[in-house]
Amino acid sequence: PARRLTSHEGMELFPKFSPDGSKIAFSAEYNGTRQVYVMPAEGGKPTQLTWYNDVGPIPPRGGFDYRVLDWTPDGEHVMVRANRLPWGVRMGRYHLVPADGGTEVPMQIPEGGGGMFSPDGTKVVYTPIDREFRTWKRYRGGRAQDVWIYDLENSASEQLTDHPATDNQPVWVGDDIFFASDRDYTLNLYRYEADGEPVAVTQHEDFDVLWPSAGPEAVVYENGGYLYRFDPAGGETRQLSIQVNGDRPGLMPKYVSAGEFIE
């Protein structure tokens, strides 16, 4: 069964496990503004990692500030997207935040949306454009996203996809790169092929594949309000069964005065 870790009245979102699974980095609003925190995976007191006064509790059109994206493979830093570029608060840049506390440092990539480190930490797969929070479907305009790789050792970028549709939320599992695309009009998970067209590995028709997140062996994503796990080794997708235990006071019967509803 699922176990609740946070209970603050504000939002806690974008959780990411550390490489060894012992910690969780996430965004939260404990002190009014959205900041990045880290806590033990089994639960406990969160530690605040960032202190910059963000753009406010209501997100800009480009998305939430301080979005946690990944950890460095050595577990020493948390990769976050922060909205503080001089040419617009809608635009975000990747920063590395020490997991034990310290000054955040901007990465070489000038602007980006979703992104993730390669398993060896030498590259980042990312989208230069951030549009994950827009609600337009089947968008084919100038800000449709494509997937790129940035080589951190050589400070060089390479474009992987070039399609009028949206290609976003890229993740890395072993040697394979997966991303969400609506090139067939519903967002599904695709595998990048260096020598050919990307291959769809899920076939959802009713709802979009949203927020894919990867670990060493699998990709987990949301679809139609449910969580699914895709295993690249076997090419299988299965819906996760999540049980939330609790007293659920909102479901308990209670007496109310119904006089105003009687005519």
Q: Model regions: which residues?
A:
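A flexible loop/linker signature enriched in serine peptidases of the S9 family
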Residues: P1, T6-E12, A25-Y37, A41, ...
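Non-catalytic accessory segments flanking enzyme active sites
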Residues: T237-E263
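Residue-level detector of Asp-centered blade-edge/turn motifs that repeat once per structural unit
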Residues: P19-D20, P73-D74, P119-D120, W172-G174, ...
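Short, surface-exposed amphipathic charged segments that create phosphate/polyanion-binding patches used
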Residues: F64-Y66, P216, Y255-S257
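Generic recognition of flexible, low-complexity loop/linker segments
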Residues: R134-W136, G215-P216, E263
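Structural signature of eukaryotic scaffold interfaces centered on beta-propeller domains
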Residues: S18, T72, S118, V256-F261
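Short coil/turn linkers that define WD40 beta-propeller blade boundaries
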Residues: G43-G44, G101-G102, S155, D195-E197, ...
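Short glycine/proline-enriched coil/turn segments at helix->beta-strand junctions
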Residues: P110-E111, V173-D175, A194-G196, P216-E217
